[in-house]
Swiss-Prot record:
Highest classification ranks of the organism: Eukaryota, Metazoa, Chordata, Craniata, Vertebrata
SUPFAM superfamilies: Ubiquitin-like
Gene Ontology terms describing biological process: energy homeostasis; fat pad development; female gonad development; female meiosis I; hypothalamus gonadotrophin-releasing hormone neuron development; male meiosis I; mitochondrion transport along microtubule; modification-dependent protein catabolic process
Gene: UBB
GO molecular function, one term: structural constituent of ribosome
Record domain Ubiquitin-like: where: 1-76, 77-152, 153-228, 229-304
Identification of the protein by name: Polyubiquitin-B
């Protein structure tokens, strides 16, 4: 079959190959055509660098596929840059390259202006004037690229283990967006995350600005152990609302959830269970409210007592 090999200069080479050919064989064919020694060749397909011992069929390279040929500079090295979207960019660099140089290479590949790039390695943000060797970044190291959005801000998320995560966010980001960023960094599924700020649990559909979360604010991350539960809230009109809660949720949290669903301000809500009015600071487990329990909602009229 025929495949194409595109070089960084834009030249396209056509090769006759078999699916069973190894990458090593392909590099030998390129040497025959172009005179480039195999040890200076790097072949990329679908964003992956191809390994010498594997075959074209291992990588699902079919007829008329296009490989990309990158020259491995003597003394140069490859590093990877992973974005928050999960895309991995491969760069050819020298240990003596500055972070500024690396950002320029990323701009060449991806079109992202250097002033919007933040590069992270081993949990540290890298400074423009320092070099890769200053940070002990070696061949095949992976850097993380975070975009510094215009008008964006940094916030911190502290876990129960005491670890602090730094996030780049916008005031207009929803709590759902923030949980997705935490998943990208830490691998924790959003449905297991509960975020707390100023003592309140944050609801997915609301934004950071709704909660007056500003730059360098610290949120607290509590893991929602599988074992969240559903409860029902019945109003005097006979309507039943379903809520997702934790036994550790306070009555105040529950009223906030009702407000999000129904628009009723918490100060107008009275919740009754087993004949008792529930107090804001107590938790569902304090009242032995279990999954599929039904609470009753009575409206406290303005001026009422």
């Amino acid at each position: 079959m025929q495949i194409f090999v595109k070089t960084l200069t834009g030249k396209t080479i056509t090769l006759e190959v078999e699916p069973s050919d190894t990458i090593e064989n392909v590099k030998a064919k390129i040497q025959d055509k172009e005179g480039i020694p195999p040890d200076q060749q790097r072949l990329i397909f679908a964003g992956k660098q191809l390994e010498d011992g594997r075959t074209l069929s291992d990588y699902n390279i079919q007829k008329e596929s296009t490989l990309h040929l990158v020259l491995r500079l003597r003394g140069g090295m490859q590093i990877f840059v992973k974005t928050l979207t999960g895309k991995t960019i491969t760069l050819e660099v020298e240990p003596s390259d500055t972070i500024e140089n690396v950002k320029a290479k990323i701009q060449d590949k991806e079109g992202i202006p250097p002033d919007q790039q933040r590069l992270i390695f081993a949990g540290k943000q890298l400074e423009d004037g320092r070099t890769l060797s200053d940070y002990n970044i070696q061949k095949e190291s992976t850097l993380h690229l975070v975009l510094r959005l215009r008008g964006g801000m940094q916030i911190f998320v502290k876990t129960l283990t005491g670890k602090t995560i730094t996030l780049e966010v916008e005031p207009s980001d929803t709590i759902e967006n923030v949980k997705a960023k935490i998943q990208d960094k830490e691998g924790i599924p959003p449905d297991q995350q509960r975020l707390i700020f100023a003592g309140k649990q944050l609801e997915d559909g609301r934004t950071l600005s709704d909660y007056n979360i500003q730059k360098e604010s610290t949120l607290h991350l509590v893991l929602r152990l599988r074992g969240g539960m559903q409860i029902f809230v019945k109003t005097l009109t006979g309507k039943t609302i379903t809520l997702e809660v934790e036994p550790s949720d306070t009555i105040e949290n529950v009223k906030a959830k009702i407000q999000d669903k129904e628009g009723i301000p918490p100060d107008q809500q009275r919740l009754i269970f087993a004949g008792k009015q529930l107090e804001d600071g107590r938790t569902l487990s304090d009242y032995n409210i279990q999954k599929e329990s039904t609470l009753h909602l009575v409206l406290r009229l303005r001026g009422g007592c």
